[in-house]
Structure formats: structure tokens, C-alpha cells
Regions:
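N-terminal, post-signal peptide beta-strand-biased segments of exported outer-membrane/organellar beta-barrel
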Residues: 4, 8-114, 321
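Outer-membrane beta-barrel porins/channels
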Residues: 8-30, 95-336
């Protein structure tokens, strides 16, 4: 299984499955992610299984993608200037497309779906009037996490009628996400002994979902192609196995709580539709994508901050339905 390099400056990946990766091959990503209606005899389409039927006879299409990113941050903290800069270089996708029979094509892809990478701190300052923390002093909470979710897709595309194709694909999601918090108290009274508390959460994901798609080309000539396409991802509960442990002191000392549960973590139902126009030199694509994150996801995240008794405080994580428009233009002066 491919493992993404951990990028530790994305605090919002503390929640759920983390940050979604932009889907598609390099060509689609350079077009703003548009490509639901893209139909080509030379490019693998990762967004719509109906495009698999475009694979020409006696031809095998293979795609391998890499992704590099540069991060730079400069800020002033307490009057002191600080800078951070680093590069990442990761595998992004492997995909192929091949004909099975006349007007029937097979497609396969292995791509990262989401990734987690963060490290942050929270300070609870000493308050002499606080009935709980008055004799403890300052407390520092450290949060960090890393992991990823990978998607494997296998599908068939069929052209039952001229210029009209349908497709179906099975999607397998798997991965591991690890989240850790450490509470470190600092005694200021010289009385009592206080030890660190370590919490570890592991999310193990393994689930199968599905996707269907259609494409229709009302204009298909030697000089130009106009295609309309749509795809629907069924989504559903990933049903991850979650192992939670809390230790006092360190991982070699007493386990306060350890259990394994199944947490509800739902991928949204996704509807996407688009239009794609191609000539020898130009390509223009427009997509609309709707995801119902808010209709099916509810989650309670634990903070690691002490509440009443042995419990940790918690808060609700809000998910919102999203609508996304993607537009891309490509110009190739001399394609052949």
C-alpha cells in the first residue's frame, strides 16, 4: 500500500478522513479537475467508468503520476521571526485502460483518496482560583496525527449504442489513520506528583463502494468532439475499526482505558456532471460536483482535555454539503 509523506501543517485534517486529494490524472488536474465528460483514445479517465469503452482495439493505455509540492511559511512569534520550508514528492496514481471486446473496455486505478498530517499545541494556563488545576500549574496538550486512505477502482465501460456509453465500477477503500494527544502538567507548588497522559486512536478502514457513469457525444467528427457526461458515487459508511487507548505516564505504564469500537464514518453520495469539447488544438471542460457530506455524517471528536471524572471533553464536528464547479482550458499548438 502506498503511504503519503506526512505534511504536518494541515490542522483541519484532525477530523474524519482528513483532506481529500484532487482526483484525476495529471491532464485532468491541470484542467482544474474537470473531466467527467472527457473521452479519449489516448488518456485514461479516472472520473467516469463510461469512458473505459473508448479504449481502441489492440491498444493498452497506462498512466503513472507523481506529485511534488513546496511549502514555505514565515511568521513572527513573540517578536522572533520564524521560517519553515520543505518539499514533498509523492506517488499520485497508477491507472490503465484496455479493450475487452468490441465497444467494451476495462479500467483500473490506484489513487490516494485522502491524507492526514498535523501537529499542534494547546496551553492551559495556571489559574489559582481553578478548583481542579490550582495545584497543578500550566498544562500543555500536544496533538498530532498521520495516515491516509487509498482508493482502488476496477470497472467496465460499454457502448451499447453509437456515441453513447455506460459504465460501472467497484471502489475499494483502505488505510490507517493514527491520532495521538499528550497532556503534560507542570507543578508549581512543589506538592504532589503529576504524570503525563497519552491518548492514542487508530482508525483502520477497509470498505467497498460503487460508481456508475454515462457519456454521450452528440458531436463526433474527425475535427471536433463534444461529450456530455455524468457519474454517481454511491458512497456509504466506511465502518472503520477504531482502537482507543489512554495511558498514564507513558505507553509502558497503566492503561486507563482501552477498547475497540466501530465508528460511523460516511463517504458522501456524489453526483457529478460535465461537458467536454475537443479539437486538434483546444480542449475545454466544465464540471459540477455535488457531495452530501452534511446529510449523512455526524461525529463527536474527543479533545483530550479532562472533563468530569475520567471522561474527556468532546465537541461536535460539523459537515456541510458541498457544490463545486471545475473549469479547465487546454491549448496545444502542435499536437502531432
Amino acid at each position: 500500500r502506498q503511504r503519503q509523506m506526512c505534511i504536518r501543517d494541515r490542522p483541519y485534517t484532525m477530523y474524519g478522513i482528513g483532506e481529500q486529494n484532487t482526483p484525476g490524472t495529471l491532464q485532468m488536474r491541470s484542467m482544474g479537475g474537470a473531466g467527467v465528460a472527457m473521452r479519449s483514445v489516448s488518456t485514461v479517465n479516472l472520473l467516469n467508468p463510461a469512458a473505459y469503452s473508448a479504449a481502441p482495439q489492440k491498444t493498452f493505455l497506462f498512466n503513472f503520476g507523481l506529485e511534488g509540492q513546496n511549502y514555505y511559511n514565515a511568521q513572527t512569534v513573540g517578536g522572533v521571526g520564524k521560517r519553515t520550508a520543505y518539499n514533498t514528492f509523492n506517488f499520485h496514481d497508477i491507472a490503465f485502460q484496455m479493450p475487452v471486446a468490441k465497444r467494451l473496455g476495462l479500467g483500473f486505478s490506484l489513487t490516494p483518496y485522502s491524507s492526514v498530517g498535523y501537529r499542534t499545541k494547546y496551553y492551559h494556563e495556571y489559574d489559582p482560583e481553578d478548583p481542579i488545576y490550582a495545584n497543578v500549574g500550566n498544562i500543555q496538550y500536544n496533538y498530532q496525527g498521520e495516515g491516509d486512505v487509498t482508493e482502488v477502482k476496477v470497472g467496465l465501460g460499454w457502448e451499447p449504442f453509437k456515441n453513447f456509453s455506460v459504465g460501472i465500477a467497484a471502489q475499494y477503500y483502505w488505510g490507517d489513520i493514527d491520532r495521538t494527544f499528550v497532556m503534560t502538567p507542570t507543578a508549581i507548588t512543589g506538592e504532589g506528583t503529576f504524570t503525563s497522559t497519552v491518548g492514542q486512536d487508530n482508525y483502520s478502514i477497509s470498505s467497498i463502494k460503487g460508481q456508475v457513469g454515462v457519456q454521450w457525444s452528440p458531436v463526433l467528427t474527425q475535427k471536433r468532439i463534444l461529450t456530455i457526461g455524468a457519474a454517481f458515487d454511491i458512497g456509504g459508511d466506511l465502518n472503520p475499526e477504531v482502537t482507543k487507548r489512554i495511558y498514564v505516564g507513558d505507553i509502558y505504564n497503566t492503561t486507563v482505558k482501552g477498547d475497540t469500537t466501530h465508528l460511523k464514518m460516511v463517504l458522501p453520495r456524489q453526483f457529478s456532471a460535465g461537458i467536454y469539447y475537443q479539437t486538434a488544438k483546444w480542449a475545454v471542460g466544465v464540471d459540477y460536483v455535488y457531495q452530501n457530506w452534511g446529510d449523512s455524517n455526524t461525529a463527536t471528536e474527543m479533545t483530550g482535555v479532562s472533563g468530569s471524572g475520567d471522561a474527556r471533553t468532546s465537541y461536535e464536528v460539523a459537515y456541510t454539503n458541498t457544490s463545486t464547479f471545475k473549469v479547465g482550458v487546454e491549448y496545444t499548438p502542435s499536437r502531432y
